[in-house]
Amino acid sequence: AEIGKTAEGRVMLMAIITSPENHKKLARYKEISRRLALADGVADDQARSMAREGKAVVWIDGGLHATEVLGAQQLMEMVYRMVSMDDPETLRILNDDILLAACANPDGMDLVANWYMREPEPPKRSTAGLPRLYQKYIGHDNNRDFYASNQPETEAINRIFYHEWFPQIVYNHHQTGPAGTVLFAPPFRDPFNYYFDPLVPMGIDLVSAAMHNRFLAEGKPGATMRSGSGYSTWWNGGLRTTVYFHNMIGLLTESIGNPTPVRIPFVPQNQLPRIDLPAPIAPQEWHFRQSIEYSVTANRAVLDVASKYREEFLFNIYRMGRNSIERGSRDHWTIHPKVIAAVQEAVAKERASGGEERGAAGGGGRGGAFRFGAAPAKYYEMMRDPANRDPRGFIIPADQPDFLTATKFVNALIKTGITIHQATRSFQVGGKSYPTGSYVVKTAQAFRPHVLDMFEPQDHPDDVPYPGGPPRPPYDSAGYTLAFQMGLKFDRVLDGFDGPFEKISGFAKAPAGKVSVSLSPAGFL
């Protein structure tokens, strides 16, 4: 199916791979996936019923970063095998799953392929020295665009994710792997982002275990995880990370491999097995075919676990959406590192003043509530300060200086599946008046984590192994807060509110500008 056009006008194609019987009911399965993901108006028993009826929807892509040539090649291999094999496992997967397979950057794939083949002698071929960006406007940062949807490729993929298919699992292939290994595969290192549902990292762990188990069962050593590299789940903006804020399981592998053979180097510390590298691999020459086989193994592990836990994945995306709606409908607090630091500081002051000697409020003899790292229960109330509640919504006034940019911001949210309302007349909230046309973004919706992450300040934890030790930086930018980046004027509303609001259908339309004519102009622009 065609899902859009690239920046250079090429067609973006997505293969929909499932059984012939499922193809006859694709519209129904798409509707089930949508209703479960959005969760609004769906009761638990209805969700259970739809989860039993539905099919697991899994997205697998390749080629987003075009010089990471393995991605596009393994994708073609995988599609061929899924439509040609008839073994029992493949047939079960085709019955239980709907695979969405797409090349994420066709422009880049053509550019890199032509550049590589310019050299007539195969041993001399290389993708190095590419003469221009492999995405016309943003190159490598096409994987930092999925919160803003600036590029047509991004917009097309986000439409599949957040408006049409709502996959439960999204697998994004990349290169290259850490030195002395074949690939990095999840699970990821801490921290995960505090806004998204804890079922997201638990779902990642479930799928990741299936991947690593299959590598070992097939005799494919050299897969590392967690501390084996720096990848985390904190940041928004990437193809596989923005999905976390939409209650989806996002996967990343970073694999070695090149059409021209490479060598796995000897890294001594990576020859000692550990929990994050259970099966080291010996230094050796490495061929592209081997990398493709590892990628296919990973793909099939994902599809296999999606098949076996189909109902759980479908119900859990509903559960996460329902949790978000409920949290946005009542007082709720997201606990951040600064809150914990404030509590610890208060506890330390009490200890220093002799509270520990008196047993404080906890009783139990000397040390009382302070024993074993505990603190008096009264300090828990600091974490429930009414002033620190999560917002129930955000109001973007129509009378701000740059309402055109505010409209662009709102449309970026709409492209990522966020429900936006607009005031049909002036209104008041919390004693403040707002004009007609103001935008309203409520947090009582399934994709609440994304709303909060686009508006709220970031508080990435200090990642220091020990006091005075070297800090470990975030994998990517710690904040993708689009409202700050675009200079938006908005108000946080901590209590429930309503007004003359109408849901925006399609995209928001900015008001027409005015041209003022002076009778005695000083000049023209």
Describe each model-derived feature in a short phrase:
Residues 1-97, 138-139, 144-145, 150-152, ...:
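Intrinsic-disorder/low-complexity accessory segments
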Residues 6, 101-106, 116, 172-180:
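Short, solvent-exposed turn/loop segments enriched in Gly/Ser/Thr/Pro and often Arg
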Residues 89, 94-144:
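Divalent-metal coordination cores built from histidine and acidic residues
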Residues 109-110, 179-182, 262-264:
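Short acidic/His/Gly/Ser-rich catalytic and metal-binding motifs that mark active-site loops
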Residues 161-176:
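Proline-aspartate-enriched helix->loop->beta-strand connector
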